[in-house]
Amino acid sequence: MTTKPIYSREWNYVREADRELMLSRHNFRKTSDFLEQILLALNDLSQQQRALEWIRDEHFSDLELEILIPIIIDIAVDGNQDRLPYAREILFNNAFNSNDIVRKKLTFMFDGFLRSEDDWIYMRLMELLCFLNYNDLRMRLIDKCKNSTDENIVDVYTSFIQNRGWL
């Protein structure tokens, strides 16, 4: 005969709170303004991380991703450094869907990032392109950095070629 484990009151509170959170998430997902609420949270720095965690953990339709991915790309390239890993994870998890939404959106936004002439953006963009293994875009960025007259931008090239060995 086995005895049933006796859990602490705190454990039972956590388990109940987790169940309630799952139910709340399920009910929220079914609301008519779900996507609008996610977009509001993505554009509010105080709620952005929670929104990114939600997007990371949920499944979204291609239509929803068409709207969300450009914002997430912008966060991954020019957002708060604490949120970069969440944004990159979302992009990576959706990079290989059947409609190739991440690649299409990033390619569309790529020239705008290049026009920024900002070494911070170039560094984050280079990291993202390596992470997603988008070699064609990465080579374009490498050429832009290598041929720049801005010493800081050339340093991005040097950092990736010499220090990280990523060509």
Predicted regions and their residues:
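Long, contiguous N-terminal structural blocks used for assembly/anchoring
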Residues: M1-I75
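Eukaryotic acidic, Ser/Thr-rich intrinsically disordered low-complexity regions
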Residues: T2-V14, D136-L167
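Structural detector for internal amphipathic alpha-helices that build alpha-solenoid repeat scaffolds
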Residues: N12-N27, Q49-D62, P85-S98, W120-L132, ...
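Amphipathic alpha-helical scaffolding segments comprising HEAT/armadillo-like alpha-solenoid repeats
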Residues: R29-L39, D62-I75, N97-G112, N135-K146, ...
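Alpha-helix N-cap/helix-start positions at coil->helix boundaries
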Residues: L45, V77-D82, R115-W120, D150-D155
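Helix-adjacent hinge/juxtasegments
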Residues: I67-A95
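Short, local alpha-helical segments
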Residues: L106-F113, D118-R124
